[in-house]
């Protein structure tokens, strides 16, 4: 019987790339996302090689999350790895210019959504025991502040601390917990953040070499497939051409 991974936000970016990476290794896949057409397309692609179960899901909906887990087919119930990938960034403008609804959406998705899924899947991960993993998608924004990050950065700081504290609670169960924290990566993420402004999204990556979704997927897979006695607590990764900025100074 092949190992089983559950990936949220599997319809694009890191989630889709992770689904392909785990499929390459023969894992069975539980894929969730809000866009049914994309889920269907990905399932059709990957089901040629591995077993795939899909569920249209908004992770913000606590009851829907629990229903998806409760209704998993018997062959998909013994989840070994959970990849909490679903998340988004909105409103790159300064905090004082942001629509409050955008802040609420980020909190509901990046924090509450991750908590909803984790809580629902924990019992089966604990039952699986040694070698089971939770991989949370964080961000360098959770560690390093920058203008326009406001609630997005704060939500990813939550992911980091939730990862660490969950790890403490799960000590002795065999379940590992990791925060994978990427820097600049070229995915649909930026297009969503800019409200669909393709020119602004393209400008961010112009004349540099960002991470690709496949780079991050490789790290997700790596942390989940290390020997059972090894836990990567946090894995921060940036493109070689990205580094930290100097402190901002306001001058007269």
Curated annotation (Swiss-Prot):
Matching InterPro entries = NAD(P)-bd_dom_sf, Sc_DH/Rdtase_CS, SDR_fam
The record's listing under Pfam families reads: adh_short (PF00106)
Q: Which PROSITE patterns match?
A: ADH_SHORT (PS00061)
User: Per its UniProt entry, what is the enzyme's top EC class, as one word?
Assistant: oxidoreductase
The catalytic residues are 152
PANTHER family in the record, alphabetically? ALCOHOL DEHYDROGENASE
Purpose of the protein: Catalyzes the formation of isethionate from 2-sulfoacetaldehyde in the deaminative pathway of taurine. Constitutively expressed enzyme that only mediates a small part of the activity observed in taurine-grown cells.
Q: Which family does it belong to?
A: Belongs to the short-chain dehydrogenases/reductases (SDR) family.
Oligomeric and partner information: Homodimer and heterotetramer.
Tell me what this protein is called. Answer: Sulfoacetaldehyde reductase 2
Species source reads Chromohalobacter salexigens (strain ATCC BAA-138 / DSM 3043 / CIP 106854 / NCIMB 13768 / 1H11)
Q: What is the lineage of its organism?
A: Bacteria, Pseudomonadati, Pseudomonadota, Gammaproteobacteria, Oceanospirillales
């Amino acid at each position: 019987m092949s190992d089983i991974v559950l990936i949220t936000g599997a319809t694009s970016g890191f989630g889709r790339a992770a689904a392909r990476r785990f499929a390459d290794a023969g894992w069975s896949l539980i894929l969730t996302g809000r866009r049914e057409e994309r889920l269907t397309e990905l399932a059709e692609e990957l089901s040629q090689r591995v077993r795939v179960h899909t569920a249209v899901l908004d992770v913000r909906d606590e009851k829907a999350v629990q229903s998806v887990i409760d209704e998993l087919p018997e062959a998909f119930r013994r989840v070994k790895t959970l990849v909490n990938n679903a998340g988004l960034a909105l409103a790159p403008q300064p905090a004082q210019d942001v629509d409050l609804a955008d802040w609420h959406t980020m909190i509901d998705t990046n924090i509450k959504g991750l908590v909803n899924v984790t809580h629902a899947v924990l019992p089966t991960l604990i039952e699986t025991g040694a070698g089971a993993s939770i991989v949370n998608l964080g961000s360098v924004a959770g560690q390093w502040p920058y203008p326009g990050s406001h609630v997005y950065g704060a939500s990813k700081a939550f992911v980091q601390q939730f990862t660490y504290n969950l790890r403490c609670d799960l000590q002795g169960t065999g379940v590992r917990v990791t925060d994978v924290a990427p820097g600049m990566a070229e995915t649909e993420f930026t297009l969503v953040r800019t409200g669909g402004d393709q020119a602004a999204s393209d400008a961010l990556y112009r004349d540099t070499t960002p991470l690709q979704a496949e780079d991050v997927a490789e790290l997700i897979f790596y942390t989940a497939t290390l020997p059972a006695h090894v836990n990567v607590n946090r894995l921060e990764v940036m493109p070689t051409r990205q580094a930290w900025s100097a402190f901002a100074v306001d001058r007269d």
